[in-house]
Regions:
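Structured adenosyl-cofactor binding patch, chiefly the S-adenosyl-L-methionine
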Residues: 33-34, 62-73, 148-194
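A generic structural signal for ordered secondary structure
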Residues: 76, 89, 132-136, 155, ...
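N-terminal regions of ATP-driven nucleic-acid and macromolecular assemblies
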Residues: 51, 57, 86-87, 94-96, ...
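A short, hydrophobic secondary-structure junction motif
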Residues: 19-20, 141-145, 181-183
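Active-site/ligand-binding-proximal alpha/beta "capping" segment
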Residues: 100-175
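RNA substrate-binding interface of SAM-dependent RNA methyltransferases
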Residues: 1-120
Length: 194
């Protein structure tokens, strides 16, 4: 992350943890660019399955399929790939960034907050409940979510509540759709042109 971005108190970045489908990466890049995200980071992530086995989920490579799914945005708004996501999250936190984890579960517990709920830590939030420090939104892998080590570093967890009682087989949105909704809800108001 550039020092200019670190100093920008209204900065908003996204960390994609092992998003494996090129169409999802492309759609996230397009939405991120359109909605004013400053930077997107991709990374490979290690997960532990129910048997204690380590599983590596790789981020989709930046191929023509990603470019097509982004409708060409990849050519003007390229993500930065990180080799050590835990070190990166620790670095931005040490610089005053507010790290937000997204998902429906954290360590097996259903999350109770949603995107319309104010942060329990209301220090440094504006009247709309948006954090005024620079923000890093962490988006997890399509099947495994956010790795526990990164999840434990998050300052706040959010999710999108369904608008109805849903079938158990439809437990979430597509990651690119969820990401766009979260960006729109969390983006600092000063970045949104009226």
């Amino acid at each position: 992350m550039s020092s200019e971005c670190i100093k920008n108190v209204k900065a908003f970045a996204i960390l994609l943890c092992g998003i494996g489908h090129p169409q999802n990466i492309g759609a996230i890049l397009r939405s991120s660019y359109y909605l004013g995200v400053d930077r997107v980071y991709t990374t490979n992530c290690k997960f532990i399955d129910s048997n204690g086995n380590s599983i590596l989920k790789s981020s989709a490579p930046l191929t023509p399929s990603v470019s097509k799914a982004s409708s060409g945005v990849l050519e003007i708004f390229q993500p930065t790939h990180l080799n050590d996501p835990e070190k990166f999250v620790d670095f931005v936190k040490s610089r005053g960034w507010f790290v937000i984890g997204s998902g429906i579960q954290k360590q097996g517990a259903i999350l109770k907050s949603n995107i319309s709920t104010q942060s329990e830590d209301s220090v440094n939030t504006n009247k709309a409940g948006c954090h005024q420090n620079p923000q890093l939104l962490v988006i997890g892998n399509e099947g495994f979510g956010i790795p526990q080590k990164i999840g434990d570093m998050c300052d706040r967890w959010i999710n999108i509540e369904p608008g109805r009682t849903i079938d158990p087989d439809v437990d979430s949105l597509n990651v690119s759709v969820a990401c766009a909704l979260l960006i729109n809800s969390l983006m600092p108001q000063s970045k949104i042109k009226r």
